[in-house]
C-alpha cells in the first residue's frame, strides 16, 4: 500500500507545538539553516517528524510572515490563482511570499468563497432595502469583472470586444444624419429598370421600321427561288425524244410560265403592301394556299405522262 506516514511511527508526538519546541527548532535552523529536515528530529531531540518540523517553520516560525487581514490586491491574486491552479495552496503561496499556504487556504474557505458565491447570484448581491450606495454598486461591478477575469484571459478579451462592438452600434444608431442620408439615397435598381425600359421601347421602334424592308427582301428571295425551281422541271422534260412526251413538256412549260406570271403578280402586290406598311405575316398564308394546288397539278401531270409512256410500250 506504499510507505506509511512518518507521524504514525511509535514515539512520535502529534498535536500542537509547545513554546519550548518552537525555541529548539528556531535555534537549530538559525545555526544550520533550513534544508535537511530529516536530520532535525534526531539532532535536536524533538519527538516530531520531519514533515511536522518543516510545516511549523514555513507556516509559523520563519521570518517575514505577514499576519492580519488580506488586502484587496492579495484577494484578487488569490481569486485569479485559485481559478487557474485550483486548490494547490503551496503553489499559490509561492506568488504571495509574505503569506503562508495555510493562511491562504483558511482565508479562502472562510471569506473569499462565500464572497464569490454572493457575487455570482445577482439576487443575493442586491440590497434588500433598495437604498444601496454608490460604493456598493462599484464593488459589485468589480466583482463581476474579476469573476470573468479569473476564469480565462480569452473570455476577458471576448467581453472587451463585445463591449466595443456595442459602443459602435449605439454610436451608429444615435447619429440622425446618417439615417437621413441612407433613407434619401435613391436605389440604383430603379434607374436601371427605367433605362432598360427606354432601351426596349427604342429597339421595338427600330424593329417595326426595319421589318417591312426585311419582309420585302425575303419575299424577293422566295420568288427567285420559286422561279428557279419551276424552270428546272422543263429542262428535264425537254430532254425526252417521244412526241407524246414533247407535248406533255410543252404543256408543262406553258403551265410553269403561267405559274411564274402568277408569282410575279403576287410579288408585285406584296411589294406594294410592304411599302404601305402592311404586315408580312398576314400575306404569307395565301402563298401557302396557292402553292398547295400547284403541287397537286404537278403530280397529276407526271402521273399522266407515265401512263402515256406505258401505253406506247404496250403498243410496241
Curated annotation (Swiss-Prot):
Organism: Antirrhinum majus
Pfam families cross-referenced by the UniProt entry: Myb_DNA-binding (PF00249)
Region (Disordered): 119-144, 168-193, 209-230
Gene coding for it: MYB306
Biased composition (Low complexity): 216-230
Domain spans labelled HTH myb-type: 9-65, 66-116
Origin organism lineage: Eukaryota, Viridiplantae, Streptophyta, Embryophyta, Tracheophyta
Stated role: Transcription factor.
This protein's GO CC annotations: nucleus
Subcellular location(s) per record: Nucleus
Region forming the signal peptide: none
Biased composition (Basic and acidic residues): 135-144
Keyword Transcription in annotation: yes
Polar residues biased stretches: 181-193
Name of the protein this chain belongs to: Myb-related protein 306
GO biological process: response to auxin
InterPro entries the UniProt entry points to: Homeodomain-like_sf, Myb_dom, Myb_TF_plants, SANT/Myb
UniProt DNA-binding region: 37-61, 89-112
Record's keyword terms, sorted: DNA-binding, Nucleus, Repeat, Transcription, Transcription regulation
Tissues where this protein is expressed: Expressed in flowers, leaves and weakly in seed pods.
PANTHER family according to UniProt: MYB FAMILY TRANSCRIPTION FACTOR (PTHR10641), MYB-RELATED PROTEIN 306-LIKE (PTHR10641:SF1290)
GO molecular function terms listed in the Swiss-Prot or TrEMBL record: DNA binding
Gene3D superfamilies in the record: Homeodomain-like (1.10.10.60)
Amino acid at each position: 500500500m506504499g510507505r506509511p506516514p512518518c507521524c504514525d511511527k511509535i514515539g512520535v508526538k502529534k498535536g500542537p507545538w509547545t513554546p519550548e519546541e518552537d525555541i529548539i527548532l528556531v535555534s537549530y535552523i538559525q545555526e544550520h539553516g533550513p534544508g535537511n529536515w530529516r536530520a532535525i528530529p534526531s539532532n535536536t531531540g524533538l519527538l516530531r517528524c520531519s514533515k511536522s518540523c518543516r510545516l511549523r517553520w514555513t507556516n509559523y516560525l520563519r521570518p517575514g510572515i505577514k499576519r492580519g487581514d488580506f488586502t484587496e490586491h492579495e484577494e484578487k491574486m488569490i481569486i485569479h490563482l485559485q481559478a487557474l491552479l485550483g486548490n494547490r495552496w503551496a503553489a499559490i503561496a509561492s506568488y504571495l511570499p509574505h503569506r503562508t499556504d495555510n493562511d491562504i487556504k483558511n482565508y479562502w474557505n472562510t471569506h473569499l468563497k462565500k464572497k464569490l458565491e454572493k457575487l455570482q447570484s445577482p439576487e443575493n448581491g442586491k440590497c434588500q432595502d433598495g437604498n444601496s450606495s454608490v460604493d456598493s454598486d462599484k464593488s459589485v461591478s468589480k466583482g463581476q469583472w474579476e469573476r470573468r477575469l479569473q476564469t480565462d484571459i480569452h473570455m476577458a478579451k471576448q467581453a472587451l470586444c463585445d463591449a466595443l462592438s456595442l459602443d459602435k452600434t449605439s454610436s451608429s444608431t444615435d447619429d440622425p444624419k446618417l439615417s437621413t442620408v441612407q433613407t434619401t439615397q435613391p436605389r440604383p435598381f430603379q434607374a436601371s429598370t427605367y433605362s432598360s425600359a427606354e432601351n426596349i421601347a427604342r429597339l421595338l421602334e427600330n424593329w417595326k421600321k426595319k421589318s417591312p424592308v426585311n419582309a420585302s427582301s425575303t419575299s424577293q428571295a422566295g420568288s427567285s427561288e420559286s422561279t428557279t425551281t419551276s424552270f428546272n422541271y422543263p429542262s428535264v422534260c425537254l430532254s425526252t425524244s417521244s412526241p407524246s412526251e414533247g407535248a406533255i413538256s410543252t404543256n408543262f412549260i406553258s403551265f410553269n410560265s403561267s405559274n411564274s406570271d402568277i408569282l410575279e403578280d403576287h410579288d408585285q402586290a406584296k411589294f406594294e403592301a410592304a411599302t404601305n406598311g402592311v404586315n408580312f405575316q398576314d400575306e404569307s398564308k395565301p402563298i401557302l394556299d396557292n402553292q398547295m394546288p400547284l403541287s397537286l397539278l404537278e403530280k397529276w401531270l407526271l402521273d399522266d405522262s407515265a401512263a402515256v409512256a406505258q401505253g406506247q410500250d404496250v403498243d410496241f
